[in-house]
């Protein structure tokens, strides 16, 4: 399928039986879009924030979330090669670099001797960053999204 070649992260995704009837999805949409529409931000339907690794679109597993917040959870798997999330190897320095990208900016977090050390620095920084954004948006997002962000764990296998 051509769409899966362009966006392989959706390859194994499914839609719940209930939402295969568009009027059921439309009703859910209209009830939940109000939670987020009152804020002057672009928003997206997300399947991964409430349940990490989720592949099913359903009323229990997805939520509307501001686009900026959703961008915190992209993992760049197709672009990062053999290294964990937030890590690349600098051939000139011969070190592993911990790096976080957000809103088009790269934040260099340090150079390390091992992949694991670089990843741990990235993990610590990114989890704190997600918590900071959650706190800043606490009054703008549903509590279930806030709680998911406050409890988010980044793993070396992500």
List each language-model region with its residue ranges.
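Extended, polar beta-sheet/loop recognition surfaces of beta-rich domains
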Residues: 129-158
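Short, cationic Gly/His-enriched loop motifs
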Residues: 5-95, 99-100
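An aromatic-rich alpha-helical recognition segment common to small helix-rich domains
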Residues: 25, 87, 98, 112-126
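Active-site proximal helix-loop segment of RNase H-like, two-metal nucleases, encompassing DDE(D)
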Residues: 1-2, 97-107
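Residue-level signal for secondary-structure boundary elements
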Residues: 2-3, 37, 130, 134
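Structured segments of extracytoplasmic/periplasmic soluble domains
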Residues: 28-32, 125-128, 132
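A short, exposed loop/beta-hairpin motif centered on an aromatic-Gly-Thr core
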Residues: 11-16, 105-116
